[in-house]
Design a protein with these regions (language model features):
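A short beta-strand-to-loop transition that corresponds to the Sensor-1 phosphate-sensing loop
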Residues: 241, 437-441, 464-467
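Conserved alpha/beta core surface patches that mediate binding of polyanionic ligands
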Residues: 57-79, 176-193, 198, 347-349
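Conserved P-loop NTPase
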Residues: 478-537
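Extended, folded cores of ATP/NTP-driven motor/assembly subunits in large transport
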Residues: 1-164
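A short helix-turn-beta junction within AAA+ P-loop NTPase domains corresponding to the substrate/partner-engaging
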Residues: 253-257, 449-463
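P-loop NTPase motor domains
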Residues: 20, 120, 134-194, 245-253, ...
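A generic structural motif
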Residues: 93-103, 212-214, 371-373, 408
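Glycine-rich phosphate-binding loop of nucleotide-binding enzymes
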Residues: 177-260
C-alpha cells in the first residue's frame, strides 16, 4: 500500500469476435512489417541481384522481437476464432488529486515508481491528461485512446479484484444503537483507513493470542477504554498482574484486588439476596460446589438439607444471610464442618462470609486475580463462580464487555471452562462480548474444548511471534485457519507495535498508534516494573486525591495535557454544582 490517496480506474471495452479479429490482424501485420529493418531489406536486395541462396547469417538482420510478436498475434487470432477467450480494449488510469500541484506531481511520480518496480510500464500524462481523466469516469468510453487490446485471460490477472480491508464504518451488532461508531480507528500502513470492531455481525467474542511482552496488555486496556464510548456500556475485566490498574484508577473504575491479604481486602456476601427464588436455586448449586471441593459427595438427602437451611436464613435480615448462619441452620456435623472453612474463623472466611458485600454496581470494574489464582482451588473456585454469577445478573441488554486475561488457566479448569463455554454460546443474546486472551496457540491446543472456543470467537487478534513459521508453531496457526501469507505477517510483525486481526469480514495488520499521554495510562513506563509504578501512583493518589492524573502527566513531561485535565475536571465539578443547586 502507498501512503497517500488516489483513484484507480479500470475501463473495459469488450469486442465481438469479428471486431477483435480485425484489430488483431492489424496488429499482426504491423509487427510482421517490423521484423525487417533497413539492413535486412538491403541484404535481401543484394541476395536477389546475385541470385544466391539465403545464408544462415541472414537471420541476424531480422528483428526477433517483432517476429515473436507477430507469431503471438497469430496465436491470439486463433484463440479469438476458437472462442476460448474474448478480447477487450483495456485502460488503467490512476487519478491523483491534490490542491498543491507540487504535492500532486510527487505522488504521481511515486505511483509510477511503484508500478515500474512491480514490472509494469506507465507514464504521467501531460497533453493527454484531460482525456485520461474523462476516460476514467463511468460512461466515457471514447476519451483516452490509450487502450491496448488484451485478452480476458490477461484482464483477470490485472483487475484489482481485492483491496485493503478498511473495516466496517459502523458497529455491525444489531443490539447496539443504530449507526454506532466502530470501536476505534487504529493506525495502518498506506492511506486506506481502518475501522476496528470486535463484532462480526452480532457476535463480539474475540480471541487474543500473544506471547509475553508482545503488547497484549496494552491492547486489552485500549479495548476496555474504547468500549466505554457506547452509551450505557459495561466493562468487566479479569486482570492478572495489575496491567489494568492505572487505567482503572484514572477512568474512575472500581478495582478489586482479590485475596490480596490486606486489612482492606475485598469481602463478599454470596447469600445476601436469598429472598429471591432465583438466588436460592443458584445458592444451592454454589454450596454443592463448596461441599464437593471439601470432599463431600452431594446426595439428594444433602441437597434437601441445603435447601431447607437456605429457606430458613432467607427470611433473616440481609446482614444475617451469611455462611455462619447457614452452618448453624444445617444441624449436620459433616455439612457444617465442610462449610466452616468458608465461614468467619475459617481459613477463607475473610473472603466469603461478610455481613455486607463489598462488590459495587459500577459500569467499569476490574478484578485483579494474581493473588487469588495463587491460592488453592478450594477458595479460588467459589470466589470466581460468585463473581461470574454477579456479572450475569448485570446483563440487562446494555453493551457489555467481559475481558479475561490469561484465559487458558480458567479454561483448563472444568468448572470455569464450562461456565466460559456457556458464556460464549449464550451471552450474544444479552449483548455481551467476551474477550479471551492467552499467550500462544500451544496453550489453546491443550484445551479439550478448544474447538468450541475457537468457533465461538469469529474475531481473532494475533500478536507478533518470530517463531510462528517454525514447524511446531506453524501447524497450530494453521489449525486456527491461517495461511502461509498470514503466518508470514505474524512472524515478521514488530512486538509491542503490530496486531493482526482476522474475521469473516476481512483481515488487517494494524497499530494502536498511541501517543505518550495515552501510554502513560495504558502501559508500564519504561525502566519500571508494574509493582513500582503502582506503589508510586498509590502515593500520588494519597497525596493529591483526584488531581493525581494531572500530577502524573506533569511527571511524565506532559504539562499541557495536565492543564487540560484540570480544566476539564473543574468544568465537570461546576456542572455537578449547578445540578445540585437546581
Amino acid at each position: 500500500t502507498l501512503p497517500f490517496g488516489f483513484r484507480w480506474s479500470n475501463r473495459l471495452i469488450p469486442l465481438g469476435t469479428h471486431e477483435a479479429a480485425k484489430h488483431i490482424r492489424r496488429q499482426q501485420l504491423q509487427w510482421f512489417k517490423k521484423r525487417k529493418g533497413a539492413g535486412a531489406w538491403v541484404q535481401e536486395m543484394v541476395s536477389k541481384s546475385n541470385a544466391s541462396q539465403p545464408k544462415p547469417d541472414d537471420e541476424l538482420w531480422l528483428d526477433q522481437d517483432a517476429r515473436a510478436m507477430a507469431v503471438d498475434a497469430g496465436e491470439a487470432a486463433s484463440e479469438n476464432a476458437s472462442g476460448s477467450v474474448r478480447f477487450c480494449f483495456y485502460t488503467q488510469v490512476m487519478v491523483v488529486m491534490d490542491p498543491d500541484p507540487v504535492r500532486a506531481s510527487y505522488v504521481a511520480s511515486e505511483i509510477l515508481k511503484a508500478l515500474n518496480d512491480a514490472g509494469f510500464t506507465g507514464r504521467i500524462e501531460t497533453v493527454n491528461a484531460l482525456d485520461a481523466y474523462l476516460g476514467s469516469l463511468p460512461g466515457h468510453g471514447y476519451p483516452n485512446l490509450r487502450r491496448p487490446l488484451i485478452s480476458t485471460r490477461n484482464i483477470a490477472d490485472l483487475l484489482p479484484v481485492t483491496s485493503v480491508w478498511p473495516g466496517l464504518a459502523n458497529n455491525p451488532c444489531s443490539f447496539f444503537p443504530p449507526k454506532s461508531p466502530p470501536l476505534m480507528w487504529p493506525a495502518t500502513d498506506g492511506a486506506t483507513p481502518f475501522r476496528f470492531n470486535l463484532h462480526d455481525s452480532d457476535v463480539g467474542h474475540t480471541l487474543v493470542l500473544g506471547r509475553t511482552g508482545s503488547g497484549k496488555s496494552v491492547l486489552l486496556a485500549m479495548i476496555a477504554a474504547q468500549f466505554r464510548r457506547y452509551p450505557d456500556a459495561q466493562v468487566f475485566v479479569f486482570d492478572v498482574g495489575y496491567s489494568m490498574w492505572t487505567l482503572a484508577k484514572a477512568a474512575g473504575a472500581t478495582h478489586y484486588d482479590l485475596a490480596a491479604g490486606r486489612p482492606d481486602s475485598l469481602r463478599f456476601q454470596p447469600l445476601a439476596q436469598l429472598d429471591r427464588p432465583s438466588e436460592r436455586a443458584w445458592a444451592v448449586e454454589w454450596l454443592e460446589t463448596l461441599l464437593a471441593l471439601q470432599g463431600v459427595s452431594v446426595t439428594s438427602v444433602i441437597r434437601a438439607k441445603l435447601e431447607r437451611a437456605i429457606e430458613l436464613i432467607a427470611v433473616n435480615d440481609p446482614a444475617h444471610r451469611t455462611l455462619t448462619e447457614l452452618t448453624a441452620q444445617l444441624q449436620n456435623a459433616t455439612l457444617s464442618s465442610a462449610i466452616r472453612p468458608y465461614a468467619v474463623g475459617g481459613n477463607y472466611g475473610q473472603l466469603l462470609d461478610a455481613a455486607s458485600d463489598d462488590l459495587q454496581e459500577g459500569r467499569f470494574q476490574v478484578f485483579e486475580m494474581k493473588h487469588l489464582l495463587a491460592l488453592d482451588d478450594k477458595v479460588a473456585v467459589p470466589v470466581l463462580l460468585y463473581l461470574f454469577h454477579r456479572i450475569e445478573q448485570r446483563l440487562d441488554g446494555s453493551p457489555t464487555l467481559i475481558e479475561i486475561d490469561e484465559a487458558w488457566m480458567a479454561l483448563m479448569h472444568s468448572l470455569f471452562g464450562a461456565r466460559i463455554n456457556q458464556w460464549l454460546l449464550t451471552l450474544r443474546k444479552q449483548n455481551a462480548a467476551v474477550v479471551l486472551a492467552t499467550q500462544s496457540p500451544s496453550q489453546l491446543a491443550q484445551l479439550s474444548n478448544r474447538h468450541t472456543v475457537v468457533d465461538s470467537c469469529p474475531t481473532r487478534i494475533y500478536l507478533p511471534n518470530p517463531d510462528a513459521a517454525t514447524p511446531a508453531q506453524e501447524s497450530l496457526y494453521r489449525d486456527l485457519g491461517l495461511n502461509d501469507r498470514e503466518i508470514s505477517i505474524i512472524q515478521g510483525a514488530t512486538a509491542k507495535r503490530h496486531y493482526y486481526v482476522k474475521s469473516s469480514a476481512g483481515s488487517r495488520l494494524f497499530e494502536l498508534g498511541l501517543g505518550p499521554v495515552a501510554l502513560s495510562f495504558l502501559a508500564t513506563p519504561s525502566g519500571s516494573s508494574m509493582e513500582e509504578t503502582r506503589r508510586h501512583l498509590e502515593a500520588l493518589i494519597a497525596l493529591h486525591g483526584d488531581d493525581w492524573p494531572a500530577v502524573w502527566l506533569e511527571e511524565r513531561g506532559h504539562a499541557a495535557w495536565a492543564r487540560q485535565f484540570r480544566q476539564h475536571h473543574k468544568s465537570r465539578e461546576d456542572i455537578q454544582d449547578e445540578i445540585q443547586v437546581a
